[in-house]
Amino acid sequence: MLTVISPAKRLDWDVATPAGATLPEFQDEAMALVDVARELDVADLRKLMGLSEKLAVLNLDRFASFAEQADTETARPAALAFAGDTYTGLEARSLSDDEMAYAQDHLRILSGLYGVLRPLDLIQAYRLEMGSRLATPRGKTLYDWWGDRIATALNRAAEATDGRLLVNCASQEYFGAVDLSALSVPVVTPVFLEDRDGTTKTVSFFAKKARGAMARFIVQNRVRNLDGLRDFETGGYRFVPDQSTETAPVFVRPYPEAAPAARELAS
């Protein structure tokens, strides 16, 4: 079983690089995208990703200083460096060495810049969202740039681990970069719902965290099939058979009443 998750906009560089760090498969592709991004100015980058001027300047500086060869001084392992709701659920820093080794083979992070990352692949600080309309020699968007490359990489990863199923815990924006016509393994996309007074809905903040928690559950329990996936109960979620399909298992929990109202945003 292979699981995919999205990256995060926020980064936390305050982490030591463990032994066994690896290099991204598409390092050359990433460098080519960096070269394209270096042609942009602050106004271009603000428009491209809806950034403030401060963030646009920061990320232009990141592209300018991007090194052709990542090392432990300038880069950090992807799963440990990304910081966001999904990574709060994943809690990669608390995985044991054995669990991280398993994740290295069975977990992939989709990325606008790097395409596909293993948890311990070294990344340099960047922000380039998959939905960005960055024009390249291959087309008008990053979806054009990546084409079937991401799907092909996932096929190789699945074959290497005898994976017969791909669990999609990524967002629509990122999983949209996977060319399904080129994918050789069936896809299952878990759905996470909150129940308030008998009405269920997806709440973006909670769903992102649950996707990360699902990825952690799969790694820690060496889940290999749908039956094992349905045992997920982290955070109070329960599998609901009558709302589920073979490709979209549904997990529901009571709405956390202490949740901040500002995060009640349906995805």
From Swiss-Prot:
Pfam families: H2O2_YaaD. GO terms for biological process: response to hydroperoxide. GO terms for cellular component: cytosol. It comes from the Bacteria. Belongs to the UPF0246 family. NCBIfam families: PRK02101.1-3. This is UPF0246 protein Dshi_3333. The lineage of its organism: Bacteria, Pseudomonadati, Pseudomonadota, Alphaproteobacteria, Rhodobacterales.
